[in-house]
């Protein structure tokens, strides 16, 4: 086993020292670099951060959600996963049907105003509960549009019908493993305006060599403190699942980023993280009785010997 997160820590440090300060869509402000890359050898363990606790259950449920082709947060809420809540909640509070307290700019306001934060949390709790209990409401306001699950599994064709990119690429890996077309794309320009959040991890490509399966991800935009650690673990898990179905060994995960940024209200958290010492990476366990990607459930995926530091909380920029 080895310490796998050093490329991530090095990139955080580089952005803090060499990054460009910019304004951004959320109004928070960032420090960013353009065109960064991290490489993780999956033979050395599973690349989940140890310098802070990463809730692996959230990563599992989100990836399984994508792989189901699901775009409704109801499945996530059933697994106590609130990663995507804010995006669905935004659709609700901006609708004509919403009659509650003013939730304009709820992301920033909840950070600055304790009383508003309390009201916001109450409204969010009511929203989540209604998504879980009311099927009609869930279909209307729990759906995030054509996000990852839709593009991966149900890419709409102009002439009608859809393309299942995940099944297609698995079939290609089995039949023509040395193809240079082992690609899945989540970026559909026609759907970008109607998505709750246009895809950040835009495209990934598989590569087979010496019986090993590697994957390179291109991510157009990466929230380095909150989002990217999840993306690293999620795509490392995806490589392992696809390798299982295709009879290959996991090779390398290469993470290429366009705008790799740290939000200004995460600077203190980043400094705290960089002062911590990393532990050895854990190992990934997959149920040996499962082979097909579509058959895996939460209980079939576990981390062994995941030793980590404590959680570091930081606000989400919406």
From Swiss-Prot:
EC assignment: 2.1.1.45
Catalytic-site annotation from UniProt: 200 (nucleophile)
Main location: cytoplasm
Keywords: Cytoplasm, Methyltransferase, Nucleotide biosynthesis, Transferase
Pathway: Pyrimidine metabolism; dTTP biosynthesis
CDD domains, per database record: TS_Pyrimidine_HMase
Residues that hold (6R)-5,10-methylene-5,6,7,8-tetrahydrofolate according to the record: 223, 317
Catalytic activity as recorded in UniProt: dUMP + (6R)-5,10-methylene-5,6,7,8-tetrahydrofolate = 7,8-dihydrofolate + dTMP
InterPro entries: Thymidate_synth/dCMP_Mease (IPR045097), Thymidate_synth/dCMP_Mease_dom (IPR023451), Thymidate_synth/dCMP_Mease_sf (IPR036926), Thymidylate_synthase (IPR000398), Thymidylate_synthase_AS (IPR020940)
Entry GO terms, CC: cytosol
Gene Ontology terms: biological process: dTMP biosynthetic process; dTTP biosynthetic process; methylation
Residue sites binding dUMP per the record: 25, 180-181, 220-223, 231, 261-263
Pfam family, one: Thymidylat_synt
Subunit details: Homodimer.
Family listed: Belongs to the thymidylate synthase family. Bacterial-type ThyA subfamily.
Purpose of the protein: Catalyzes the reductive methylation of 2'-deoxyuridine-5'-monophosphate (dUMP) to 2'-deoxythymidine-5'-monophosphate (dTMP) while utilizing 5,10-methylenetetrahydrofolate (mTHF) as the methyl donor and reductant in the reaction, yielding dihydrofolate (DHF) as a by-product. This enzymatic reaction provides an intracellular de novo source of dTMP, an essential precursor for DNA biosynthesis.
Protein name (database record): Thymidylate synthase
Gene responsible for this protein: thyA
């Amino acid at each position: 086993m080895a310490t796998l997160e050093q490329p991530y820590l090095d990139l955080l440090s580089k952005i803090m020292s060499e990054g460009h300060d910019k304004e951004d869509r959320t109004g928070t402000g960032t420090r960013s670099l353009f065109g960064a890359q991290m490489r993780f050898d999956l033979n050395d363990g599973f690349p989940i951060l140890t310098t802070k606790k990463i809730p692996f259950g959230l990563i599992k449920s989100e990836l399984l959600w994508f792989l189901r082709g699901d775009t409704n947060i109801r499945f996530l809420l059933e697994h106590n996963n609130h990663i995507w809540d804010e995006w669905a909640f935004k659709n609700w509070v901006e609708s004509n049907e919403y009659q509650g307290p003013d939730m304009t700019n709820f992301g920033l306001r909840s950070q600055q105003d304790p009383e508003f934060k309390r009201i916001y949390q109450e409204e969010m709790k009511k929203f989540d509960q209604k998504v879980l209990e009311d099927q009609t409401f869930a279909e209307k306001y729990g759906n995030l549009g054509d996000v990852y699950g839709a593009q991966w599994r149900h890419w709409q064709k102009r002439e009608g019908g859809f393309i299942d990119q995940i099944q297609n690429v698995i079939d290609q890996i089995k039949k023509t493993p040395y193809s240079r077309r082992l690609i899945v794309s989540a970026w559909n320009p026609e759907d970008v305006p109607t998505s709750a959040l246009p895809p950040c991890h835009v495209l990934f490509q598989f590569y087979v060599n010496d019986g090993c399966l590697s994957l390179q991800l291109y991510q157009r935009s990466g929230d380095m403190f909150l989002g990217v650690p999840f993306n690293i673990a999620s795509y490392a898990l995806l490589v392992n699942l696809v390798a299982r179905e295709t009879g290959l060994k996991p090779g390398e995960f290469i993470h290429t980023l366009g705008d790799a940024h740290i939000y200004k209200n995460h600077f203190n958290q980043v400094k705290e993280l960089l002062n911590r010492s990393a532990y050895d990476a854990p190992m990934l366990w997959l149920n040996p009785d499962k082979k097909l990607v579509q058959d895996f459930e939460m209980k079939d995926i576990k981390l062994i010997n995941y030793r980590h530091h404590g959680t570091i909380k930081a606000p989400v920029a919406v």
